[in-house]
Amino acid sequence: MYTLSVSSLNEQIKALLEESFSRVLVEGELSRITFHSSGHIYFTLKDENSTIKAVIFKANAAKLKFQLQEGLKVILDGAITLYKPRGEYQINCFSISPAGHGALALAYEQLKNRLASKGYFESSRKKQLPKFPKRIALITSATGAAVADMLRVAMSRYRAIEIDIYDVLVQGDNAAPSIIRALSLADTKGYDIIVLGRGGGSIEDLWAFNEEIVADAIFSAITPIISAVGHEIDWVISDFVADLRAPTPSAAMEMCLPDEKELYQFIDSLVARYEQMISQKLYGVKQELEHISRLYQDHSIEKKISYKLEEIAQLKLSFTNSIYFKMQSFNKEVESIKIRFPNAIQSRINIVQNQVLTLQKMLESNHPRLKTKKGFAQISKDSKVIDIESLIVDEVFDLMSDRVVISAKVINKKNI
């Protein structure tokens, strides 16, 4: 028997293990998981009685569809190898799948729960879609049936819409990066709405819309986004993150575009309603103007002047009649005196008659109405006769003759 070095022994054991256990499937529970900065993942697989160390290197770790979690039961597909520096054997994993659960289904639930805890699905952060969009970006496969359906529905509903198509991969390993690039570009172009769309398929076909990087891009976008992936029964992560989920691509167009025919009918009804409102308003204004006009006529300056002139005429008539009756009485008295004292008082009678005539002329000459007939004008303000000396510069007053009333303004005032 010969002596072996530690390194030599570990080397022989490593060769035996790798030859004997080149491919194994091992089921157990994940424990003591370490995500190394290199991208490798180190962990322990255990059952009720024992444990074994395991590693999945970066290249294979990147292919995992779900996140490794403590206590998760999994099936490892790999090979037994020995880590010579410490003489520890471990499982070098080629792939890992959940035990009793599909890897994609588990990854879907894990990501959904993680994004929900981060607030990605909160209704408060959902952006409102415009009622009348002008420009829409469709991020989809330019050769798929979904884009044809979306364009057909759009043109039948709202021909004024402008649509740009961003051709992307919608399935496969490169689909998610393709979608992100198109979404990032479209988000800078000022579209009213962005639609992520594709037709139905298996969970593998739709998986690009379940990727976390796609969810992050949707969440960060400033443009309202509609997720229209698959059929009505298909739910993907983008449906929860987007501002609106449409059950199908065609439904997305129906949900974001107004119906042109219904819009025209609405406009017609709106015009009719406003015409009726305007007509009623105009009628009300007309009635109000007529009322104001009547009030103006009842309270106008001309009306007041007319009333005052009538009063003056009545006063003049009353005054004239009074003078006439007094004169008649006086003349009778004079005649009586003349008869009784024909000679002695004749001269006195003549004097009195002259005084009476003079008084009558003075009365007539001082009457305002008679003065205005001779070219004079009466000064008044607010229908009241005033003294010219009381007027000041810029004051407005009325000049009244026997036929007209003129409104005037004091421009200058001088004493003479």
UniProtKB/Swiss-Prot annotation:
GO CC, any one term: cytoplasm
Subunit structure: Heterooligomer composed of large and small subunits.
Keyword Transmembrane listed: no
GO molecular function, a single term: exodeoxyribonuclease VII activity
Protein name listed in UniProt: Exodeoxyribonuclease 7 large subunit
Primary location recorded for the protein, binned into one broad class: cytoplasm
Organism annotation: Sulfurimonas denitrificans (strain ATCC 33889 / DSM 1251) (Thiomicrospira denitrificans (strain ATCC 33889 / DSM 1251))
Catalytic activity: Exonucleolytic cleavage in either 5'- to 3'- or 3'- to 5'-direction to yield nucleoside 5'-phosphates
EC number(s) reported in the record: 3.1.11.6
Known function: Bidirectionally degrades single-stranded DNA into large acid-insoluble oligonucleotides, which are then degraded further into small acid-soluble oligonucleotides.
Keywords of this entry: Cytoplasm, Exonuclease, Hydrolase, Nuclease
Record-stated family: Belongs to the XseA family.
GO biological-process terms attached to the record: DNA catabolic process
InterPro entries from the UniProt entry: Exonuc_VII_L (IPR003753), Exonuc_VII_lsu_C (IPR020579), OB-fold_nuc-bd_dom (IPR025824)
Encoding gene per record: xseA
Location relative to the cell: Cytoplasm
